[in-house]
Amino acid sequence: MIKVAISGYYGFKNFGDEAILSVLVNHLKTFENADITVFSSDIEYTEKTYGVKAVKRFNLKDVIKTIQNCDVLVSGGGSLLQDVTSLKSLIYYAFIIALGLLFNKKVIIFAQGIGPLNSNIAQNIVKNLLKYCSYVTVRDENSLKLLEKLGVKSELVCDPIYSLDIKSVPQNGVIGVQLREFKTMNFE
């Protein structure tokens, strides 16, 4: 049996993050003996929706116990390692990764968007953690270039959302569009 712990922005019912978790869990379930535990803000929702175990993401005792008992820690997808939202968010996800490394677990950074990393502290945190991870994949060229600049080896993969089984998504005739300003990107 392989025990996998998954860290990300899960249980907040953010469509993009939940879709990424769905793809990741479905892939892991193709391995016959996968025992999956997700760090979530809403344990009941995550367990019911994905058929996995879940622990409260801010329950330090449960998070540490889960990481100590897992074989692999997966961090991702989404854009978890960035300091635009807040440095606190980056520190939380970095702390989870650091625990995995501290307990000598295989740590996989899964299809993340890395950055922007505006502060030197954010750049140093990401650089000094990710270089020790077992496998780092990113979902876009900018993330690949940023990690290359920081001296972190990574691989470019497609965004996991493209693997989502859209047949399982309820069809109600509504299309949603989310507009977001990216101050660090020039689209001209």
Where are these regions (language model features)?
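Active-site anion-handling motifs in enzyme catalytic cores
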Residues: M1-E188
